[in-house]
UniProtKB/Swiss-Prot annotation:
GO biological process entries: defense response to virus; maintenance of CRISPR repeat elements
Upper lineage: Bacteria, Bacillati, Bacillota, Clostridia, Eubacteriales
Sorted UniProt keywords: Antiviral defense, DNA-binding, Endonuclease, Hydrolase, Magnesium, Manganese, Metal-binding, Nuclease
Enzyme class label: hydrolase
Quaternary data: Homodimer, forms a heterotetramer with a Cas2 homodimer.
UniProt keyword Magnesium present: yes
Protein name: CRISPR-associated endonuclease Cas1
């Protein structure tokens, strides 16, 4: 099993025999054995050619591209080896059955709210009012009849959740402050952390979907569109509070991230290269952390939990068993 590699410098990628070389514009080279690469994340300005893409396609390496501010721009992935016409038809039929689609969407958000509440209850002396508000939105969501109602309850719950961030920040006694969630563009360090973390989460989920027979463009909570892998957005809802928020709180709590790790350009606040490296290190550590799985009776990593979620969705779509989303028990 390969690993993720991150390229922050500007340069070019070349292939020599069975090794990929990254060469920066000063002539420094670093070899990356192709068998060891599972995903390649490119943050710098990097030149590559079709020969390179044809070569890595044989090994099903997923390439994710990020813009100047570190936000996800798109992916290159080879022709899928794991395909199933039956599953594709069932995945589309599930979307076309509106009542069934709403039911699936509700399970994603119920899991997300479970993990949001889990985070809040760790600081219960500071967050009790937010817990009550989100629990109320969770009840409303469970009675929803439309996707709009589901997303409305989710949006209100997440707004309350983000309002609780200052309770966390004050409790942790640090220099960060958070007014409200601003996505386009992020305008302060906390918003920059959330946006960058969510962007990484989407690419991680996409990578796990890609290993299965699921089609990443057919989704249930988020409306499918022509320019996004919307199923990764659906499944990321489950894991953002469990992984991304946990990393953010941990880094702030331990003083691992500083204001010097952020830059601002024309009102856009973003993690600079040093900040991105710090975040990715902790993010990868979180993904590799293991828990004892109650059903499988073995240790599984957080990354594997994402793929297991894909498999559970497949079983539901094939009619093998009901879908029960992950709800952290540890």
């Amino acid at each position: 099993m390969g690993r993720d590699y991150y390229i922050f410098s500007n340069g070019r990628i070349k292939r020599k025999e069975n090794t990929i070389y990254f060469e920066d514009f000063e002539g420094n080279k670093k070899g990356l054995p192709i068998e060891d690469i599972e995903r390649l994340h490119i943050f710098g300005e990097v030149d590559l050619n079709t020969k390179f893409l044809n070569y890595i396609s044989r090994y099903s390496v997923l390439i994710s591209i990020y813009n100047y501010y570190g936000f996800y721009s798109g992916s290159y992935y080879s022709k899928k080896k794991n395909v199933s016409g039956v599953l594709l038809v069932n995945q589309a039929l599930a979307y076309d059955n509106y009542e069934f689609r709403v039911a699936i969407a509700k399970t994603f958000i119920d899991s997300a709210m479970h993990h949001i509440l889990r985070n809040l209850r760790r600081y219960k002396e500071k967050t009790s009012e937010f817990v009550k508000a989100i629990e109320n939105e969770r009840k409303i969501m469970k009675e929803a009849k439309t996707i709009e109602e589901v997303m409305g309850a989710e949006g209100r719950a997440r707004k309350k959740y983000y309002e609780s961030y200052n309770a966390f920040l004050k409790f942790l006694k640090n220099d960060f402050h958070f007014n409200k969630r601003e996505k386009k563009p992020p305008n302060d360090p906390i918003n920059a952390l959330i946006s960058f973390g969510n962007s990484m989460m989407y690419t991680t989920v996409l990578g796990e979907i890609y290993k299965t027979q699921l089609d990443p463009t057919i989704s249930y909570l988020h409306e499918p569109s022509t320019k996004r892998f919307s199923l990764s957005l659906d499944l990321a809802e489950i894991f953002k509070p469990l992984i991304v928020d946990s990393v953010i709180f941990n880094m702030i709590n331990k003083g691992m991230i500083k204001k010097s790790d952020f830059d601002t350009d024309e009102g856009i606040c973003y993690l600079n290269e040093n900040g991105r490296k710090k975040f990715i290190k902790e993010y990868e550590n979180k993904l590799s952390t293991t828990v004892r799985h109650r059903t499988l009776n073995r240790n599984v990593s957080y990354r594997e939990l994402i793929r297991l979620e894909c498999y559970k969705l497949i079983k539901m779509l094939l009619g093998d068993e009901d879908y029960k989303p992950l709800k952290a028990w540890w």
